[in-house]
């Protein structure tokens, strides 16, 4: 059995992320989306909210599950008996950073990283950009799953009060 991890903060999950998850699920027997906890970053959504949004958005992928994790990604991968990391790439800048991480993960743990070129429709999409545009009243409904978009709007309304 082959298995892979799709790591990230997913604050919130975007359609670009879902594209990568679906493509990974088509290539691997088991895929775990790892919602990584960074104690130095305060997210808009809690880790539990992010996990719930991803689960709702990936319910049609039976070989995919969602977990949280912290610490070294390769430890997360090894503890679950998996053998690969899948990362989406939007730009050459993404590649430069992710290649260094992939080489380090291979060096310290022998874990391979597979890069998936983001679909052109999502090449500009990021969680940060979606949040920023939505904060100023811009329409980001085409960038997020519908339920995630509604949650984002709810968070922003709550902050305005």
UniProtKB/Swiss-Prot annotation:
- Substrates-to-products reaction catalysed: (R)-4'-phosphopantetheine + ATP + H(+) = 3'-dephospho-CoA + diphosphate
Q: Where is this site: Transition state stabilizer?
A: 17
Annotated positions binding substrate: 9, 41, 73, 87
Q: What class of enzyme is it?
A: transferase
One GO biological process from the UniProt record?
coenzyme A biosynthetic process
Needs which cofactor? Mg(2+)
| Location within or outside the cell | Cytoplasm
The EC designation for this entry is: 2.7.7.3
Q: Tell me one GO molecular function of this protein.
A: ATP binding
Pathway(s) annotated for this protein in UniProt:
Cofactor biosynthesis; coenzyme A biosynthesis; CoA from (R)-pantothenate: step 4/5
Positions annotated to bind ATP: 9-10, 17, 88-90, 98, 122-128
Q: Work out whether the entry's keyword set contains Chloroplast.
A: no
- Main location (coarse class): cytoplasm
Q: Name one GO cellular component term.
A: cytoplasm
**Lineage: superkingdom:** Bacteria
Q: Could you list this entry's UniProt keywords, alphabetically sorted.
A: ATP-binding, Coenzyme A biosynthesis, Cytoplasm, Magnesium, Nucleotide-binding, Nucleotidyltransferase, Transferase
Tell me its family.
Belongs to the bacterial CoaD family.
Q: Which HAMAP family match?
A: PPAT_bact (MF_00151)
Q: State the function annotated in the UniProt record.
A: Reversibly transfers an adenylyl group from ATP to 4'-phosphopantetheine, yielding dephospho-CoA (dPCoA) and pyrophosphate.
**Quaternary data:** Homohexamer.
What is this protein called in UniProt? Phosphopantetheine adenylyltransferase
Which species is this UniProt entry from?
A: Mycobacteroides abscessus (strain ATCC 19977 / DSM 44196 / CCUG 20993 / CIP 104536 / JCM 13569 / NCTC 13031 / TMC 1543 / L948) (Mycobacterium abscessus)
């Amino acid at each position: 059995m082959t298995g892979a991890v799709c790591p990230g903060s997913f604050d919130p999950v975007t359609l670009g992320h879902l594209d990568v998850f679906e493509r990974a699920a088509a290539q691997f027997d088991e895929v775990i989306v790892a919602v990584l906890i960074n104690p130095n970053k305060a997210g808009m959504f809690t880790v539990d909210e992010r996990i719930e949004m991803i689960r709702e958005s990936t319910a049609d992928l039976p070989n995919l599950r969602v977990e949280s994790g912290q610490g070294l990604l390769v430890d997360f991968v090894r503890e679950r008996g998996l053998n690969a990391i899948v990362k989406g790439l939007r730009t050459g800048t993404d590649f430069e950073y992710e290649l260094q991480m992939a080489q380090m993960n291979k060096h310290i743990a022998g874990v391979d990283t597979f890069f998936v070129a983001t679909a052109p429709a999502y090449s500009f999409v990021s969680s940060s950009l979606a949040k920023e545009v939505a904060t100023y009243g811009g329409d980001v409904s085409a960038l997020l799953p519908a339920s995630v978009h509604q949650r984002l709007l709810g968070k922003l309304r709550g902050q305005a009060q």
